[in-house]
Structure formats: structure tokens, C-alpha cells
Amino acid sequence: VPKQFLEINGKPILIQAQILELLQQMKLKSGVAVLLITHNLGIVAKAADRLVVMYGGEVVEQGSSMDIFYRARHPYTWALINAVPRIDVKLEEELTTIEGTPPDLIQPPTGCVFHPRCPYCMEICRKRKPQVTADGEHISFCWLNHSMAPKVEIPIRQERE
């Protein structure tokens, strides 16, 4: 049960950075766990040891920060990473977005909750919830990770020259 709750969204960036630094120091000194709930992947990359990626109220991927950022296995995670603004691209380039609209949580779609927006959607995605696949502590819920699924190239942007 959390002993403290601290809201940092909406605060100036420098204040957010100072709060995160203070939380990191507290974590190291006292060994307490810090739970961050955020959509800001910059904060996540800097502060989190482990990540749980959720979409439509469901876990779609979970693992270490390194696994999620460098070996993501779910199309929603790929889309999130690709949507992060980068300083090494021209300002004229449009930001990457995730096509479609978020699911209706009152009447969620059958099958995989991400399938209506997923560019890799297969028939099974529309009908059945994905089974968990695990690689050590890195887990994901996506039919693309099934041994019988077609292989796809992971579309995470590479560093540009």
C-alpha cells in the first residue's frame, strides 16, 4: 500500500526533474520502491527499472526498461516508442501518431484490445485474447509472438545519421 502519492504531471519540466532526482535518491538510500504512473516515456527511460505497458486497461508488455526500450515485443509499445519526439529530426517532420481511436472501455473489443488500431492485426487477434509469451522476465501479450505467427520487422525508428 503506497505511503505517499505525488502528482508531477503539469508541473514545469525543471520541477519534475528535481522531484524525480529526489525520488531516486530516496530509493537508493532507503530501499523503498517507487511506482511511477505516467505516459511520459522520457521520465520512464530515466527513472524506471521495470515497466508495465498498458493499453485499454490491460497489460500488453512487461519487463526491464532495457528490454522494453531495446527489445519491445508488442505493436503498441513499438508505436509508443516511435511517437516520442526526437531532437535529431527536422522540425518540419510530422510527429508520429497512433492511427485510430482508443477503445471503448465500457464495451471493449473482443480479442486483443489493441487490434482495431494495430497495423499487424491478424484474424486471431480479433477473436481471442493473446496468450502470454515470456523470455525470462520480459512478457508480452501478442499473437505476433506465437511460434506460428508470421515474422514482422520491428518498426522502431533507428538512430539517424
Regions found by a protein language model. Give the residues of each.
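Conserved beta-strand and immediately adjacent loop positions that scaffold enzyme active sites
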Residues: 4, 50, 131
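Short capping/connector residues at structural and topological boundaries
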Residues: 2, 10-11, 48, 92, ...
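Residue-level preference for short coil/turn positions at secondary-structure junctions
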Residues: 1, 28-30, 108
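Charged, flexible cofactor/metal-binding loops and thiol motifs
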Residues: 65-160
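Short glycine-rich loop/turn motifs that provide flexible caps or phosphate-binding loops at active sites
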Residues: 9, 41, 62, 99, ...
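N-terminal glycine-rich phosphate-binding loop and ensuing alpha1 helix
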Residues: 1-21
